Amino acid sequence: MPTRIVPALACAGLALICGSRAKADPDFGYVYTADIEEPDETELTLWATHRAGKGEGHYDAQDYRIEVERGLTDRFQVSGYANFAGHHVRGLSGEFEPVHRDLAFQGLSAEFKYQLRSPEKRRLGIALYAEPGWSRISKVTGEHATEYEFELKAIVQKNFDNDRLVWAANLTLEPEWEREHEEIGPGTKSRETEKELGVELSTGLSYRVAPRFWLGAEARYHSVYPDWTHGLRRENYAVSAGPSLHYDGGEWAVTATFLPQLFGGPGRAGSSLELDDHEKTELRVKISHEF
């Protein structure tokens, strides 16, 4: 187990014994549901994601997010994020330079989520989501770069078997503008801005196997379109899927999802995986507390 994510898992173990009352619906590691925080309720969430494996050399990265979520009305909630990152990169070719950084402030983002229809009473739940963000460290390479993004998400959710089985799916569009701080000559730095569009389809299914425990699976398709304002040309894609576990203790909740990449393209010689913009495996743990 990656040592850098052990503290998050230790906190998760502590959270397992702190709860009091269970909620109706589960949380997923990557897939969003159409549920909305109740008015005047606040939730604090720690996200910890470990990404590893590029097919050569050594690559491991950690993404940490501290989220404060607040319900404003019966249908609208807002969140603020402080993002941190760690990268350990060596022996990779292409755009990857050696990076050894345990933890650094990465950037800020905000979330706005509006529920069009609740998933209660066996209806199809629908929600819309927007997340503007700013980053000072590239998520993939770990190098310093100024990035602006605007994530847009359509969310659907359907509950079955008296809410014991929950299905959710997301369509995500994420335009991004990046300016790398690259030195191209003595005292001269590149100021070129690159545009990129990420397109993602994700889905999750979770079943309540005990009063507080949910067991399920998640799947994700993610693709990248460079210079998207001049036409859509897919540069690469990756498909990942894996198990998801959620524990709801009332005020405390813990979610863990493991997503290995199944296949992608274009793959490198002798591999069916896309390892330029994606990794071999991802492990995410989320710890939430309501107050």
What residue spans do the PLM features occupy?
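Bacterial N-terminal signal peptides that target proteins for export
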Residues: M1-L9
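Low-complexity, intrinsically disordered short peptide segments enriched in small/polar/basic residues
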Residues: P2-T3, L14, E69
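Cleavable N-terminal signal peptides
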Residues: C11-A12, A22
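Local alpha-helix boundary/kink/capping signal
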Residues: G13-L16, G249
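Transmembrane beta-barrel domains of Gram-negative outer membranes and organellar outer membranes
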Residues: K23-E290
